[in-house]
Amino acid sequence: MPPFIPKSRSNAVESVYLHGWVRDMLLESKTSQNIAVIPRVDPDEASIPLLSRRIYANRRHFVKITKFFQVHNYSVYASVKDSQHQILSQFTPKCVSEFESRNRSRITSDTVNTLFMIGDAKLGIMVVDELRHYFGEKIVSLFNGLDMPYIPYLIINQAFILDYDQVEAFKMTPFVYQYI
């Protein structure tokens, strides 16, 4: 007999900070590249983000890291998610350096499924061959059959840990690319 899930539990959320924004962001910026999509976070506000109305008001500041793919020339290539979709991303060398000196640990060390606050991010695009190089063949296979010559990804220049709990997703979160 399958487990009984009460109606109140069927809409459970992983975090009150995660909201669906990735798909809308991509639809808004479909015609442009290298545009700023997430504003910079003042480091003083980042130390107590829950008291900052400016940070909390922008849903795009909050993501979870779902997987790390590769480190290349001090950039870290990963996938991040909101409450509904995943998107490929690059943590820039500046972001990685600042994160690691502030936290005294590697950005890739025990941070999968950790809630992050990000800032100073823009949207970039990559051709499939570049994608294969940075994210691997498995990711490229996701784009077979999609009519997308360029794949958008998030370029993140600021990252702060908001919550160290590594709560796994209740359900599989799909990549956003088939929905745009």
Curated annotation (Swiss-Prot):
Pfam family, one: TPP1
GO molecular function (one): GTPase activity
Record GO cellular component, one term: chromosome, telomeric region
Entry keywords, A to Z: Chromosome, Nucleus, Telomere
Biological process (GO), any one: telomere maintenance via telomerase
Nucleus is among the record's keywords: yes
Gene3D superfamilies reported for this sequence: 2.40.50.960
Domain of life: Eukaryota
InterPro entries in alphabetical order: TPP1/Est3 (IPR019437)
Summary of the function given for this chain in its UniProt record: Component of the telomerase complex involved in telomere replication. Stimulates RNA/DNA heteroduplex unwinding which favors the telomere replication by the telomerase.
Family named by the database record: Belongs to the EST3 family.
Subunit structure: Component of the telomerase complex.
Record protein name field: Telomere replication protein EST3
Organism of this sequence: Candida glabrata (strain ATCC 2001 / BCRC 20586 / JCM 3761 / NBRC 0622 / NRRL Y-65 / CBS 138) (Yeast)
